Amino acid sequence: MSELSFDAPVWHHGKALRKGYTTGSCATAAAKVAALMVLRQHLIHQVSIVTPSGVTLCLNVESPHIEGQQAIAAIRKDGGDDVDATHGMLIFARVTLNDSGEITLTGGEGIGTVTRKGVGLPLGSAAINRTPRHTIESAVREAIGPARGADVEIFAPEGEARAQKTYNSRLGILGGISIIGTTGIVTPMSEESWKRSLSLELEIKRASGLTRVILVPGNHGERFVREQMGVDTQAVVTMSNFVGYMIEEAVRLGFCQIVLVGHPGKLIKIAAGIFHTHSHIADARMETLVAHLALLGAPLELLTLVGDCDTTEAAMEHIEAYGFGHIYNHLARRICLRVMQMLRFTKTPPVCDAILFSFDNHILGSNRPVDEIAKELQC
């Protein structure tokens, strides 16, 4: 994408909606400019970064300050017309140079701390997600060169207060906000517009001659397909939370095979017949796990532990500890059954497969051997 693609508005019902950028982009830009200020020993008032999606952002720097081998800078979060709890707040970075050759990244005031398992980050660590961690470290490394080291602290003075308006506490992230964003860009869009844009991608794939499609909730699914299945991601289409809608669109377009690939946190809902997986529609993850564990003969102790979990990842640890990992194959088959039930009035329903994977990109389960599915997708 180019810089113009960020400036171009998103149109919805004849209204131009402005894009924004994530807390991850703010932290990356703040860290980069702070590192540059330490090296150059003069204040910088504008900085550019390239987001993970390839969009170039040129951002204004606020509160720049240099003191010896340390500098501080801030970037103001702008969510565009998709305003959330972090919109308008300052995300700061403090960079201190050293001779270690290593870059360390920590969270300071206003950045949440991970207190529960299940969010993909170590207990006790700052709530700075994987993609922003990578972009922050890469931006600082680019600025300071290969030999120097740096201590990078991300902080947000308003973070603790703003976090009260988020779901962080329910996820066990306490004391502040999370630094997030897999693309770096916030795209405002209504649900119907978003669904239509996803459907358009399906139409383009079908028009190119593809007859088999892999539907994933988001970026992690696409990476799994590429790295673990060895399948061309040309066949991958994001379905977001709109599982039922995208399956129906794939059927309408004449795809002969649909493969659902994702983390259990999303796909497990399909096993319960939930085809819109956003949490504001329905959850039932733990209830679904408990029900199917019970069907497999799991002890009451495990059922109780899983039922008390707040995240799927936390439940998965208990499942592994009790030796019930075979539930994922069972759930994958159940997911396919639910899809076929939904399509029971379809004249020629497609083949349906389901693959569940962990945050570490390991295969957890599938309705049939993954190698067999991958081979068919490569035909």
Curated annotation (Swiss-Prot):
Keywords carried by this UniProt record: Cobalamin biosynthesis, Methyltransferase, S-adenosyl-L-methionine, Transferase
UniProt pathway: Cofactor biosynthesis; adenosylcobalamin biosynthesis; cob(II)yrinate a,c-diamide from sirohydrochlorin (anaerobic route): step 6/10
One of the GO biological process terms: anaerobic cobalamin biosynthetic process
Enzyme Commission number: 2.1.1.195
Domain of life of the source: Bacteria
Pfam families: CbiD (PF01888)
Disulfide bonds: none
Catalysed reaction equations from the record: Co-precorrin-5B + S-adenosyl-L-methionine = Co-precorrin-6A + S-adenosyl-L-homocysteine
Keyword Isomerase: no
GO molecular function: cobalt-precorrin-5B C1-methyltransferase activity
EC class of the enzyme, as a word: transferase
Family matches, as InterPro entries: CbiD, CbiD_sf
PANTHER family: COBALT-PRECORRIN-5B C(1)-METHYLTRANSFERASE
Family: Belongs to the CbiD family.
Protein name: Cobalt-precorrin-5B C(1)-methyltransferase
Species of the source: Salmonella paratyphi C (strain RKS4594)
Lineage of origin: Bacteria, Pseudomonadati, Pseudomonadota, Gammaproteobacteria, Enterobacterales
Gene this protein is translated from: cbiD
